[in-house]
UniProtKB/Swiss-Prot annotation:
Tissue expression summary: Tuber.
Protein's recorded name: Patatin group M-2
Further information: Patatin have a dual role as a somatic storage protein and as an enzyme involved in host resistance.
Alphabetic keyword roster: Coiled coil, Glycoprotein, Hydrolase, Lipid degradation, Lipid metabolism, Plant defense, Signal, Storage protein, Vacuole
Glycosylation sites: N115
Active site, per annotation: S77, D215
Entry comment, domain topic: The nitrogen atoms of the two glycine residues in the GGXR motif define the oxyanion hole, and stabilize the oxyanion that forms during the nucleophilic attack by the catalytic serine during substrate cleavage.
GO molecular function, one term: nutrient reservoir activity
GO CC annotations, alphabetized: vacuole
Protein function: Probable lipolytic acyl hydrolase (LAH), an activity which is thought to be involved in the response of tubers to pathogens.
Residues spanning the signal sequence: 1-23
InterPro entries registered for this protein in UniProt: Acyl_Trfase/lysoPLipase, PNPLA_dom
Length: 386
């Protein structure tokens, strides 16, 4: 009798724990963030292809897409382009691009996008081909049509303020319901590289609203993870299904942040003696590299510290290559040879350990994330069916 009683107590304890875990997983907000970095977007594209493949395998569904699993997908610069590709609907209201289509997109269009304009007074590239291909691929689709919440950053040089394009903010700011191709060009219009982008939308009163935008990296300095988390928090607070989530409650966030690679630990370091001889132009190029590397590091440091403080370190995964060398460090080298190298970087990165203190590889960590994303999606689907 005592044995039976003990068994029943243990059974109900396990049942209660399982129910609690399922409830927490069901209410978890899932976030994908993709850095900027020009042609180096090939690196996170490789990671996205692997993750989407894992989701298709876990759910036994070849039509599974990343937008089906993430509440918020955010990106800046080339990361904004990737965000649009995997969230913009086609005629069947499914993402117009699968993750496996992204790398071929770079190979086909990258050499034309980064085709030197020959101008000595304007930007290095005229941006005409980039805008043309974005118009062809994204059509007349606007922000409100995105298949999940998006967070794509840009910076308005006329108002001197960041501009964040999200679905959830359209009720308050309908002028932000811009065409996706305008948004994508704007977030990629890096100073020095591409011309700023001007376009108009309309306010709720029908008045013209002007945008004068440049690269989202000016606003988020390359890593939009904090921006994406902020949008996810606001989204959660406005959705009754997530009413239990408090502001920036990272215990109920699942964040995957994808970098485009840095060289901060290896190549292109400088001495004070070298820098003392630089002119303004040399400083401009170096500062951009330094700022991007430093910002990426500090954003990762802050987020990982907060997740650890909340005992939720397994809810955050930063996938980043810190050992880029040679041509792979350049955001505009779209030669076939360099793009092949970037593919190799991404594929090799999957086999590397997440940290020096953990034997878990990025590949294993992404498989773990895929299982969590799949389980959470199934829990929500089951609840919705009742």
């Amino acid at each position: 009798m005592a044995t039976t009683k003990s068994f029943l107590i243990l059974f109900f304890m396990i049942l209660a724990t399982t129910s609690s875990t399922c409830a927490k997983l069901e209410k978890m907000v899932t976030v994908l963030s993709i850095d900027g970095g020009g042609i180096k977007g090939i690196i996170p594209a490789i990671i996205l292809e692997f993750l989407e493949g894992q989701l298709q395998e876990v759910d036994n569904n070849k039509d599974a897409r990343l937008a089906d699993y993430f509440d918020v997908i955010g990106g800046t610069s080339t990361g904004g382009l990737l965000t649009a590709m995997i969230t913009t609907p086609n005629e069947n209201n499914r993402p117009f691009a699968a993750a496996k289509d992204i790398v071929p997109f770079y190979f086909e269009h990258g050499p034309h996008i980064f085709n030197y304009s020959g101008s000595i007074i304007g930007p290095m590239y005229d941006g005409k081909y980039l805008l043309q291909v974005l118009q062809e691929k994204l059509g007349e689709t606007r922000v409100h049509q995105a298949l999940t919440e998006v967070a794509i950053s840009s910076f308005d040089i006329k108002t001197n303020k960041p501009v964040i394009f999200t679905k959830s903010n359209l009720a308050k700011s309908p002028e932000l319901d811009a065409k996706m191709y305008d948004i994508c060009y704007s977030t990629a219009a890096a100073p020095i590289y591409f011309p700023p982008h001007y376009f108009i939308t309309h306010t709720s009163n029908g008045d013209i609203y002007e945008f004068n935008l440049v690269d989202g990296g000016v606003a988020t300095v390359g890593d939009p993870a904090l921006l994406s988390l902020s949008v996810a928090t606001r989204l959660a607070q406005e959705d009754p299904a997530f009413s239990s989530i408090k502001s920036l409650d990272y215990k109920q966030m699942l964040l995957l942040s994808l970098g485009t690679g840095t060289n901060s630990e290896f190549d292109k370091t400088y001495t004070a003696q070298e820098a003392a001889k630089w002119g303004p132009l040399r400083w401009m190029l170096a500062i951009q590299q330094m700022t991007n590397a430093a910002s990426s590091y500090m954003t990762d440091y802050y987020i990982s510290t907060v997740f650890q403080a909340r005992h939720s370190q397994n809810n955050y995964l930063r996938v980043q290559e810190n050992a880029l060398t040679g041509t792979t460090t350049e955001m505009d080298d779209a030669s076939e040879a360099n793009m092949e190298l970037l593919v190799q970087v991404g594929e090799t990165l999957l086999k590397k350990p997440v940290s020096k203190d953990s034997p878990e590889t990025y590949e294993e960590a992404l498989k773990r994330f895929a299982k969590l994303l799949s389980d959470r999606k199934k829990l929500r689907a089951n609840k919705a069916s009742y």
